[in-house]
Amino acid sequence: MSTSQETQPHWSLKQSFAERVESSTHPLTSYLFRLMEVKQSNLCLSADVEHARDLLALADKVGPSIVVLKTHYDLITGWDYHPHTGTGAKLAALARKHGFLIFEDRKFVDIGSTVQKQYTAGTARIVEWAHITNADIHAGEAMVSAMAQAAQKWRERIPYEVKTSVSVGTPVADQFADEEAEDQVEELRKVVTRETSTTTKDTDGRKSSIVSITTVTQTYEPADSPRLVKTISEDDEMVFPGIEEAPLDRGLLILAQMSSKGCLMDGKYTWECVKAARKNKGFVMGYVAQQNLNGITKEALAPSYEDGESTTEEEAQADNFIHMTPGCKLPPPGEEAPQGDGLGQQYNTPDNLVNIKGTDIAIVGRGIITAADPPAEAERYRRKAWKAYQDRRERLA
């Protein structure tokens, strides 16, 4: 898709990742830019393996070379859903150890109330272990706003651990932190509250009853309290040097374009993605796309599309979204680059994706996973993708 950006590149294409930190509107985007500079890596591994043990082993081996690990939890056999010791928790420990962010490629698409539950509840509780997720916005921009609300609510509650205790007494409603906590306690109260009567006789010979009420209460304690027991071993709690741990904020990538042959995501859809991103900068980090969309206009994407809205030049120029692009594949030394996998996936080299098309992070899957030496191949991709980024800056300087 040709755009005016080819002759007038957006400022974000010229700046270093370190320089773009200053203009970032999302804490996680700022962190990722700094992490990329520290590791000199703009590589994401698409870890599409079939078993949890293979996923964890691959993340541990390739972690030093990447800044993002992309997962599909629902295709993993043996995924342990335990919130503290399960697969998600172990991935989070590896992310801290090696310095990368976890991107769950969930592609949410549904009404707002449904995606909120899919994101923060259910068996996987994606929000708790994945820094980043993504969405297909065919369901509308309101879905993005709903996910942002769910992430914010989770973020506000995360500094505290909920402690449940059983005591004898009368419950007081204002002891509960919020409406949700009160609802949870009410459910517990139904289970454990018992009215027990024992028959005795008073001194005058009359029967009397002694009534005992057992009450469940909840208190909140800071998550860093020394009284809380660690659920991951100390060896797994190593932290990558050179940068602090990632912020607890959560981020969304909007699926704006795909590389599969015959993809139905046309220019009108991509333009709606751009509008949704600009309206939700506090939650949207950027895009999964095939080109750089910073500063893009409706005329460049869908000139005949009448949406009744307009974007000012100032709004377009303020864009500083991060871009990730899949389908990256390097040929063996001395061979030409492959064009695809025969299943609709179209491949691109790091230079084409990062230097020419302007993406920030190259996503690589089978090129690393199926290699004889995945860590060594990951390093080869890291070097090539980083050089493509340096070449882009030099070319546009």
Curated annotation (Swiss-Prot):
Metabolic or biological pathway: Pyrimidine metabolism; UMP biosynthesis via de novo pathway; UMP from orotate: step 2/2
Keywords per UniProt: Decarboxylase, Lyase, Pyrimidine biosynthesis
Protein EC: 4.1.1.23
Residues involved in substrate binding: 48, 70-72, 105-114, 347, 366
GO process annotations (BP): 'de novo' pyrimidine nucleobase biosynthetic process; 'de novo' UMP biosynthetic process
Top-rank taxon, per record: Eukaryota
InterPro entries tied to this protein: Aldolase_TIM, OMPdecase, OMPdecase_AS, OMPdeCOase_dom, RibuloseP-bd_barrel
SMART domains linked: OMPdecase (SM00934)
One Pfam family this sequence matches: OMPdecase
Catalytic residues as annotated in Swiss-Prot or TrEMBL: K107
Reaction equations catalysed: orotidine 5'-phosphate + H(+) = UMP + CO2
Annotated family: Belongs to the OMP decarboxylase family.
Protein name from the UniProt record: Orotidine 5'-phosphate decarboxylase
Organism, as annotated: Neurospora crassa (strain ATCC 24698 / 74-OR23-1A / CBS 708.71 / DSM 1257 / FGSC 987)
